[in-house]
Amino acid sequence: MEEVIERFLKYVKFDTQSDEDSNTVPSTDKQLKLGKNLVEELKEIGLSGVSIDDNGYVMAYLPANIEKNVPALGFISHMDTSPDMSGENVNPQFVENYDGNDIVLNKDKNIVLSPKDFPEILKYKGKTLITTDGNTLLGADDKAGIAEIITAISYISKHPEIKHGKICIGFTPDEEVGRGADYFDVKKFGADVAYTVDGGDFGELEYENFNAASAKITVHGRNVHPGSAKDKMINSISVAEEFMRLIPKEQAPEYTEGYEGFYHIVDFQGSVEETKLQYIIRDFSKNKFEDKKKLMLDAAKFINEKYGRNLVEIEIKDQYYNMKEKIDEVKYVVDIAYKAMEEVEVKPLVRPIRGGTDGARLSFMGLPTPNLFTGGVNFHGKFEYIPTFAMEKAVEVIVKIVELYAEK
């Protein structure tokens, strides 16, 4: 299974950081470089229908080798890495037989991956880890997923004794900026059901995610010379702070976990004359999600009525919804993945995604798509790492899922 590690190390050398401020598709041209490389690799391992479209979506399939009518099965990962940290000149480091102590990522900058800060790393004592050098993210999210999918499909294609239906492969751009499913052609992809391989911790199996919305708030003020401002000036920064106090502080990300939703302020820029705020709103429950949006609208209304003028403008846009309602209609996709993990001695960790994946959007586009683990930990930053055995096991899980579908 060294093959999956070699692929991963090759892919992380491609800088594929996406850009949320870009209006192009994909948001960065550099994602296309990896996409074109993957196209050649998929052709080399003998897949059919290999293509990359103008938007950067890579698709291919392995034809069925059985007559039996079984669901066409898809596996999907994304090529871009997070805008949160550089993905240029990634320099992976190997930590063999991890001893449970601090890992010095960068001596010069005193960057240390410590179990004091990240206690879950102790689960991997005795294992080989791939870390960053402290200057970039690693890119396991989601180049580990790409490596695992291609390695599994390559193995299946070389072993005709493994019976399987049609297997569809898709690699998307711009997942990290919320646009991964925007131009995904479900009909062209050709699968009945699919899995994203975009999860984190070893054993994760996810089919619930947040309902998500964004809120943009503009607060209008009135600037007057401060020396003569009494009863005239309206400081939009002060009004914005007043608005923020109406949003439950205890429902911020840093105070929530599990199935708890949150309000998260992600940007605040202002002057006396005008202040702009951006929030994201998240909840697993559709009712609580709607309540959260209403609370924000009511907060704006309250302030406008208090001041007797429309100082606060608010625009709320839904982004994606909890895929559970769509997955429940075809629950066998979760049951098969669960069984596959157990059969290759991986303990399934069924937990909600406190975020979103391409699969959430795709599930509402007619392609039910739960999420499988990659094995990566601490995504989007310099403390990202991945145990090599987890990548190898992910390959085994994908192969076993394919086998179980052929038996369905």
Annotate each language-model stretch with its function.
Residues E2-D29, I130-T131, Y320, H380-G381:
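N-terminal capping segment at the start of a domain
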Residues E20, G49, E161-K166, K249-F262, ...:
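Flexible, glycine/charged-enriched surface loops at secondary-structure junctions
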Residues N23-V70, G74-I76, D80, S86, ...:
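A non-catalytic alpha/beta surface segment that caps or lines the substrate-entry region
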Residues K68-K166, F171:
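Active-site metal-coordination/substrate-binding segment of hydrolases
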Residues I103, K127-A140, P173-L297, K301, ...:
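Midchain, well-structured core segments that form catalytic/ion-binding scaffolds
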Residues T132-A140, K347-R351, K382:
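Short pre-catalytic strand/loop immediately N-terminal to key active-site residues, enriched for Gly-Thr
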Residues I234-P253, N287-K301, D335, K339-E342, ...:
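His/Asp/Glu-rich mid-to-C-terminal helical/loop segments that flank catalytic regions of hydrolases
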Residues S238-Y255, F262-H264, L311, Y321-P370:
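Active-site-adjacent substrate-binding region
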